[in-house]
Amino acid sequence: MTGRRPKLIASDLDGTVVAHYGDISQRTIDAFRRAHAMGIEIFFVTGRPPRWMPEIKEAFGIGNAICGNGAMLYDLHSGKVLEEWLMAVDAQLETVKRLRAAIPQISFAVESHNYFHREKKYIPRWDVGLDNVGVELIEEIMTAPALKLLARCSDQELSSDEMLEIALKELDGIVTVTHSNPHDSLLEISAIGVSKGATLAKMAARLNIDAADCVSFGDNPNDFSMLQWCGRSYAMADGHPDGPKHAKSVALPHTDDGVAIVIEELLELPA
């Protein structure tokens, strides 16, 4: 590895530094803490809403958080939302209208930092209990700007990649569409122009840090914008097969502490 030590490290969470069963290795925690102690800015850049972040604060105890695939800047330490880039109601309604026509079996949920609402036929994987009833049509409750719109094929007839291909054509210029799990038949939709990469670029600019001095890690399509923007970036070897097309390098699987290994090497470089 050549070059200089980065000034900013940005990492996805799930499937990148957090195992699919929820554990974070001590080696990974130690690597991030050491980087932070050396003056490197740390950003955890995730599709998660803030209600899923307490375990990250508890594990690492350092860093900044960009949540909702770039739609929110969140203070891990105080638990406060600092900034949001939300999806307008008209964009939500147009998105639902177009996707219903293109994918008849689709169902929807909508979330902000403090709520999660779903259609009755939308079966949540993780937020069980936040909305036990649901509504017939999500349009009934689309009355406020949203952090993220979720669209699922409950019968899993289409994969997330297949759904994304359709949605990108139907929603071009209206919203940002991505996904974070090729096996879940689930799309994640944000306001136009909102992405992990776009928000990370804003934060770096505020810190007067160039893309060349930033390193990022990610495993799925919602990470690709961040991998593309950073001067050095690593797709996870066990992530989406298209990851290496968008990153400059490949890290070992998260199960082998791939991110920690790279950070340890980066910290040996001159400042």
Can you describe what each PLM-predicted range is?
Residues G3-L8, I24-S25, E188-A271:
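Mg2+-dependent phosphoryl-transfer enzymes with acidic/Ser/Thr/Gly-rich catalytic loops
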Residues Q105-F217, P221-W229:
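Conserved acidic, metal-coordinating active-site core of Asp-based
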